[in-house]
UniProtKB/Swiss-Prot annotation:
GO cellular component, one term: nucleus
Keyword Transcription regulation carried by entry: yes
Protein localization: Nucleus
UniProt keyword list: Activator, Chromatin regulator, Coiled coil, Nucleus, Transcription, Transcription regulation
InterPro entries associated with the record: Tscrpt_reg_Lge1 (IPR021581)
Spans annotated as Disordered: 1-150
Coiled coil spans: 172-203
Biased composition (Low complexity): 1-20, 47-60, 115-126
Comp. bias (Polar residues): 25-34
Protein name: Transcriptional regulatory protein LGE1
Function: Involved in transcriptional activation. Also required for ubiquitination of histone H2B to form H2BK123ub1. H2BK123ub1 gives a specific tag for epigenetic transcriptional activation, telomeric silencing, and is also a prerequisite for H3K4me and H3K79me formation. Its precise role in H2BK123ub1 formation however is unclear.
Pfam families reported in the protein's UniProt record: Lge1
Length: 230
């Protein structure tokens, strides 16, 4: 025998309580309990509460579609009915300071090439000319300059002539002659000095030899005197 219940369902002994099913859960009390279901508290751990045999859940859940940040149609279960709604992301579009996540930021496109350079390059290649098109940022090539040869002073000339930086050719030639004569005189003096040194060395050797000869004569004279005395 079934008894009327507040939720409009029937409860049989030994069977299941087929009441209102808010989220697919089923309440099975003991078989000895014939009265309406009793609960210790109206609140649940998941945030819902019971009222007049019905279950009201405060937190919305999405069915059929994943949860996204912007513009996704979701369905929530509130008070025993489903209320689909469309979440608008107009506040993100109107706000200029909103930034997308790091991996979704759009890269600005590269600037298009200038029309003047593209037209000139295409016209140059279409005419079949061998000259490459000149770009806007090209610079003229530097002129080739042959390196200047370094002036070397001859060995037989005095370097002081060129240090005076005299542009007069006649005077420069006279200076060259004067310095040349000076060099010749210096060379002769060096030769004379060398000759004098040789003569002094020979004189010293001769004097030493004379001393040796004088000692030899003295020794021989002493020997003769000793023989005569005997």
């Amino acid at each position: 025998m079934s008894e009327p219940n507040e939720g409009g369902s029937s409860y049989r002994s030994g069977g299941n309580y087929n009441g209102y099913k808010p989220s697919g859960n089923r309440y099975q009390p003991n078989s000895n309990n014939r009265g309406p279901p009793r609960y210790r508290s109206n609140h649940r751990q998941d945030g819902g509460y019971y009222n007049n045999g019905g279950y009201h859940q405060q937190q919305g859940y999405g069915y059929g579609q994943p949860t996204h940040a912007h513009g996704v149609q979701r369905q929530t279960y509130r008070g025993g009915s489903y209320h689909p709604y469309q979440h608008s992301d107009s506040r993100y579009g109107s706000n200029s300071t909103y930034r997308r996540p790091y991996g979704q930021q759009s890269v600005p496109p590269a600037p298009p090439p200038s029309t003047a350079s593209s037209v000139s390059s295409s016209s140059a290649y279409s005419r079949g000319s061998n000259v490459l098109p000149v770009s806007r940022n090209s610079y003229p090539s530097p002129k080739y300059e042959q390196p200047k040869k370094k002036f070397t002073i001859p060995k037989d000339e005095n370097p002081f002539i060129y240090m005076m930086s005299n542009d007069d050719h006649s005077r420069t030639s006279k200076l060259k002659e004067v310095y040349k004569e000076n060099d010749q005189i210096d060379n002769k003096l060096e030769e004379l000095k060398l000759k004098i040194f040789k003569d002094e060395l020979e004189l010293g050797l001769m004097s030493t030899q004379c001393e040796k000869d004088a000692l030899n004569v003295q020794l021989t004279q002493e020997k003769l005197d000793s023989l005569l005395m005997n």
